[in-house]
Amino acid sequence: MKRLGFLFLASILLLPNAAPAQVASPAPAASAPAEAAGVVRETLANGLRVIVLPNKLAPVATTYVSYGVGSDDDTMPGIAHATEHMLFRGTSDVSGGQLADIAARMGAEYNAFTTDEYTLYYYKFPAAYADVVLHLEADRMANAAIRAQDWATERGAIEQEIRAQESRPLHAVSMKLRERFFAGTPFATASAGTVPSFEKMTADDIRAFYRAWYKPSNATLIVAGDVDPQRTLADVHRHFDAIPAGEVPGRKPIEVPPLASSSLEEPIDFPVGVGVLAYRQPGSNDADYAASRVLAQVFSSGRGALADLTATGKTLGVLSFTNQYPEMGAGFLLAIPARGSTPQAAQSLLSGVLDDYRTNGVPTELIDAARTRLLSEQAYQQSSISGLGLAWADANAQHRTPDAVYAAIANVTADDVNRVLRTYYTADHRLSIVLTPKPSSTVPKTDPSAGVEHVGFTPTMHEPLPAWAQSALKAPLHPPSGEIGARPHRLANGMRYAVRRETAAPTVVVSGVIRTSPLLYEPKGKDGVHLLVDALLPWGTTTYDRKGYEAQLDAIAASAALGESFALKVQAKDFERGIALLADGMLHPAFAPSAFAIVRANTMQSVALADKLPKTKAELAQRLALYPPGDPRRRDVTEQTIAASSLDDAKRWYRFAFRPDETTLAIVGDVAPERADAAIRKYFGAWKAAGAPPSFRFPQLRAKAKQAQTVTVKVPTNVQSEVTLKQVFPMRRDDADYVPLLLANTMLSGEGTGSLLMEELRTHRGYVYTADSDFNVNAAGAEFSISFSSDPKNVGRANAAVVAMIKRLQSAPLSAVELQRAKALLLAQRVLPLDSYAGVAADMLAGVKDGYTESDESWFWNALLRTTPGQIQHALRRIDADHFVRVIVEPGS
């Protein structure tokens, strides 16, 4: 499905740490409540701050370890970032390979990121392994090895990461923007580092930085999830007490000079221009920080004047987002001009909205709704174990608790919001940016010595685990236990739904999906009419117009998404009203001609722009190479097919595709099944289907002549080459090879740095920063792919290494240990997403779009646990390693 992603645009446009303001937030809380019951906090004798957040939603836990050091403290450009990388390369007690193996055996997800002010490491894992993770984090804090030979290889990987950032179309202009907007502060430079800085950096430099900053007195440990607080504290003491407190260097104070008004106009190698206004905001240490958050929420309101710019067809899209630092904040407004307009005109529209707000004040009803929605986030944090832990980590970075953050928001007045607007959002203190589309004909130059293979490095092999880890991980694998799903119900009209009662938060999540197939049933020459229907639904119902519907959601601080996939987030006390609004949006769309005209024009422009993106060109070329002429999977949505679709076509598609007997709902949260049942029957029971249900059977994939194909897409601004290898073949999920291929895919890419692809392409050879594989079976058949990004000179080497690896796996069975890791990961992947109401709902809907519901059937888990190395070897022979369809998006013109 083609859509121009505005959040994607923002992510590649400006600055790291951008936090888009949300149009709608979860359910409300009238005021910020006292600190959540059960929270335990303690500071160890060595200064380590510990926060334990018990939450019994699922047998899952997360840990966050936040160190008070970031790129602001760099002694060399990027050294904080490099230290983060090297702390995954092992310690004096646990090698990098063992670290990856332990995580895989637990089925854990883990990663880290470096910001300007702090570095955060996190694990998400089955809660039974909490002690193992605490052991690993204590070891990382005290004993990181940071060996020269490891840095020699990791340098290549981190340089690939930097090159990936440099390949973004707007990287160069974002650096100019940073330099001007943050002039005189550490934020003005690229926090991730540069290739030249990493070439100069040594392991000794990194080790010295680590020893200076990685101290318990400079760290906070957060444990959230299904844990016993007192037992967890005892384990923390056992693992961390012996680490000396140490002293850390003093942090340099950051002075923020005033921002003088200036303009920046730059050409960009992107298919659309953008008008941007950038303003300074209060930092998180400022008394007006809470008011600035409320103002940012107002900017993203669906009832606000910024949203009206798109609703009236004046812009293709508008986005507001912020960057926050203790000393200062940054607020950005972006507008993409509608067809026939210019970035300058779009920017003037943004300025006009701000002028009106400054003159007349921000509407009080929008301020009230924004404040209530922000306060509602506290209730929803309780509905997600990971979200709860991350909220505390974020608040900790601001040196406060979430309760203090919400208490400040609760006290924000309309006068506060208007004062912040009139003080900070002024023409005298803003950066005005106009980005004009202009395709580049210049291929960036790269350092030929950077990111090369370090042939002297001895590859790390999987090793026996330390005795303590072997003991902790010796328990045999078992299928998930307990009631993961819920018993389905069916209305007389055929609609299916299931309810799972959870009481971790006073909120409810409703997720729904309608099984449709535009590829099979959209009229020829009108591909994409389903996009028009999905885009039209939020424009109002026969009961409420667009703003009226948004106002009804605001009244209960609920959020609703409408379309073939639809959802509701609502406070439990307002469940019936939320269901009524959801049903009204899905069953009674207005389909106003005026709205259709704007939606079609915007969709035509979005599709036309998306068609110019290299990724879109690559995906289309790959589909055409994979499927034979006449196959529906070759169909493509274009500007012309959208233009050919009328309002009557949209109405016909809605009547054909939106039918109760192809609809499934999952309801998760603090609502009794009887209450949910009554509401669903009341508001969805009268929905009727038109005609017989459609068939979703695709043409059988036929074996094609064996011929390896390579398609190349040139991008002048790319620094790296992005490579995808793909094959398709007939398969159903009840095929004997399905589960073995799932396990094979998990071994290839599911184990993080310990996966087969990452070990071969990154750890051993330094060709890539990341590599991935994917295996998917749906109603159309099976798809298997491998993807990676590398310097152009390494594409052939990396490709050859991938082919050789597949052939090795086909010729010799994997070890029992490798298979055990893959099984543990797949089992954990079943459990870890259940750490939130939304994750439980998604699990309950798994496979519905493709007509499968095996996620709740015991046969799948029995098949997984019985799979042998020989079965995986046999199943992998379905892959023809010499005949992938390969697409390369590479530098060039």
Annotate each PLM feature.
Residues 5-16:
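Bacterial N-terminal signal peptides
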Residues 18-51, 228-267, 273, 280, ...:
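Proteolytic maturation boundary segments
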Residues 47, 65, 81-83, 103, ...:
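Buried hydrophobic packing residues in well-ordered domains
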Residues 62-124, 190-192, 300-315, 327, ...:
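M16/MPP (pitrilysin/insulinase) zinc-metallopeptidase core fold and M16-derived inactive scaffolds
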Residues 89, 93, 124-155, 233, ...:
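M16/insulysin-pitrilysin zinc metalloprotease superfamily fold
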Residues 90, 133, 165-215, 236, ...:
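Scaffold signal of the M16-like zinc-metallopeptidase fold and its non-catalytic homologs
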Residues 104, 145-163, 228, 247-261, ...:
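Acidic/histidine-enriched alpha-helical segments
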Residues 276-278, 299-337, 385-388, 724-728, ...:
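A structural supersecondary motif
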